């Protein structure tokens, strides 16, 4: 996460900083981190060079702020009312459907907004790796909490491992998102997230399990 020593700004200053980060995040999603310069961010955000220097030490600092913002975006996506607490098979299916609905608007344009950053920062320093790891840990944790509750209620068998299933959901999403972006095909992400949900469903007690629905039943919007 960004340095704790980052100076505190006024409310207006925080708003300006957040706007710059939002602009940088959008540019980095479209062009990549390496393809996004500080000058491009400054011009697009319509701020001065002194403002950039005031809010960010350098491009690395700005990139860390973008990681933090995208981490918040992931949490917000998973907080949609229809997803509840991700603690039912219906909620997990709604999660898969929500991702499929975003294929044309998001995933075919740049992949996953968080995963695309991680992919480009594989060779980054340990501090940035820590930022990215924190995001993935939090993401997995959202599913983990819901799956623990499902097992407690008896919606999953006692032998179900909530941590294993949570990691499977996030890993399936990330792999599917990458392949959908690379191939420009909706099929990989659609197949991956639906297969991950069906894997969770396979741990439901026999009396509550149902037949898997066809993976291609729901078509992406757009």
Where do the PLM segments sit?
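N-terminal intrinsically disordered/low-complexity leader segments
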Residues: 1-15, 206-222
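Helix-turn-helix
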Residues: 2, 19, 23, 27-61, ...
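Hydrophobic alpha-helical connector segments
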Residues: 65, 79-111, 162-169
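Short, basic, alpha-helical segments at the C-terminal edge of helix-turn-helix-like DNA-binding modules
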Residues: 68-75
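Short secondary-structure transition hinges
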Residues: 76, 97-144
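Hydrophobic alpha-helical bundle segments that form small-molecule/ligand-binding pockets
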Residues: 85-86, 124-128, 137-165, 203-213
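Amphipathic C-terminal alpha-helical segment
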Residues: 102-105, 149, 169-187, 199-209
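Hydrophobic alpha-helical segments that form the core
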Residues: 110, 115, 160-179, 195-199
């Amino acid at each position: 996460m960004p340095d704790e020593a980052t100076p505190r700004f006024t409310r207006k200053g925080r708003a300006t900083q957040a706007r710059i980060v939002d602009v940088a995040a959008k540019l980095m999603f479209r062009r990549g981190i390496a393809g996004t310069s500080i000058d491009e961010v400054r011009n697009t955000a319509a701020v001065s060079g002194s403002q950039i220097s005031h809010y960010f030490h350098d491009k690395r600092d700005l990139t860390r702020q973008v990681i933090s913002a995208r981490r918040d975006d992931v949490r917000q996506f998973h907080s949609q009312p229809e997803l509840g607490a991700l603690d039912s098979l219906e909620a997990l299916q709604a999660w898969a459907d929500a991702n499929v609905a975003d294929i044309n608007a998001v995933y075919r344009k740049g992949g996953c907004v968080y995963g695309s950053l991680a992919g480009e920062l594989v060779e980054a320093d340990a501090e940035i790796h820590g930022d990215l790891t924190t995001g993935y840990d939090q993401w997995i944790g959202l599913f983990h909490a819901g799956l623990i509750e499902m097992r407690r209620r008896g919606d999953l068998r006692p032998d179900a491992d909530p941590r294993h299933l949570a990691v499977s959901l996030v890993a399936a999403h990330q792999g599917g998102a990458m392949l959908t972006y690379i191939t420009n095909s909706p099929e990989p992400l659609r197949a991956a997230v639906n297969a991950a949900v069906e894997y969770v469903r396979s741990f439901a007690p026999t009396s509550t399990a149902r037949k898997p629905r066809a993976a291609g039943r729901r078509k992406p919007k757009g």
